[in-house]
């Protein structure tokens, strides 16, 4: 079934603060839950982006019949900005979408018949063998479960090819790269502008969908041109930096700067960390 979950990260670990942080990245992108399932994870950097990505999250969840996570931080959850909402859908559009849901939506009433189950909705074959076992009052066996996992794997591979989203900012002539996501990425963007004003050729890579991670954006960097990468996060130790390292494979030096415990990373701090390298 489609599901959208919003995670507004706060300072941790354990019973930490309710201030902004980015300490749940690993949990959201690497350890989503038992059984090895995965989900698309979007991470807005502005309120407008939060609005747009929320709509997109529901579309993706319904498309794949799979959970989608909105991974934001306390800044996004607490601040106010003007936003533009998409146009209202017509009654005809709403009715068309409603009809499309009839092949998976259960009504919750025992005395009503459950509508036809479309086993082809999710990745094609899905767990037909498992469903047959359940219908017969049996537990799904290894054969059906393995088939389900294999089809899921095909879905995840398709995400990696078709569902990445990343912002490349002033990267055309960049000799240095600052990277970050969410609020840290937004602040990093202002640091890039300030450094550019000083004549430093620096650009930014900001993942907007953090799972699947946009590895290709980093793999495309020319090690003969880029002198180093500075990863900026509101997490100590850094977490997204591990994905950056995996993409770069030691071809370019990578450094990490972070704040934690509910402290919001600042533009001047990023600039100071950059100049110290």
Predicted region positions:
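Flexible glycine-/small-residue-enriched beta->alpha junction loops
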Residues: 4-38, 92-97
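Redox- and metal-dependent alpha/beta enzyme cores, enriched for Fe-S-associated oxidoreductases
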Residues: 164-201, 205, 211-217
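Peripheral docking tails and interdomain loops at the edges
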Residues: 229-277
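Conformationally flexible catalytic loops at phosphate/diphosphate-handling active centers
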Residues: 65-167
């Amino acid at each position: 079934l489609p599901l959208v979950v919003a995670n507004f990260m706060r300072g941790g670990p354990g019973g930490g603060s309710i201030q902004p942080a980015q300490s749940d990245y690993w949990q959201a992108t690497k350890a989503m839950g038992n059984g090895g399932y995965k989900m698309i994870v979007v991470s807005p950097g502005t309120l407008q982006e939060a609005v747009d990505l929320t709509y997109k999250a529901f579309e993706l969840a319904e498309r794949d019949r799979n959970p989608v996570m909105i991974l934001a931080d306390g800044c996004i959850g607490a601040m106010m900005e003007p936003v533009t909402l998409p146009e209202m859908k017509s009654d005809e559009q709403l009715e068309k979408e409603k009809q499309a849901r009839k092949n998976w939506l259960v009504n919750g009433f025992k005395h009503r018949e459950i509508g036809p189950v479309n086993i082809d909705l999710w990745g094609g074959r899905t767990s037909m063998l498992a469903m047959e076992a359940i219908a017969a009052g049996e537990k799904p066996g290894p054969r059906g479960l393995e088939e389900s996992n294999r089809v899921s794997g095909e879905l995840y591979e398709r995400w990696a090819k078709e569902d990445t989203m990343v912002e490349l900012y002033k990267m055309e002539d960049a000799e240095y790269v600052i990277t970050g996501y969410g609020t840290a990425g937004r602040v990093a963007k202002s640091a890039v502008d300030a450094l550019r004003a000083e004549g430093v050729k620096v650009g930014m890579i900001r993942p907007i969908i953090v799972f699947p991670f946009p590895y290709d954006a980093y793999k495309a960097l020319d090690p003969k041109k880029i002198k180093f990468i500075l990863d900026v996060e509101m997490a100590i130790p850094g977490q997204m930096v591990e994905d950056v390292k995996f993409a770069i494979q030691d071809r370019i030096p990578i450094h990490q700067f972070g704040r934690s415990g509910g402290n919001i990373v600042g533009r001047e701090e990023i600039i100071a960390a950059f100049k110290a390298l």
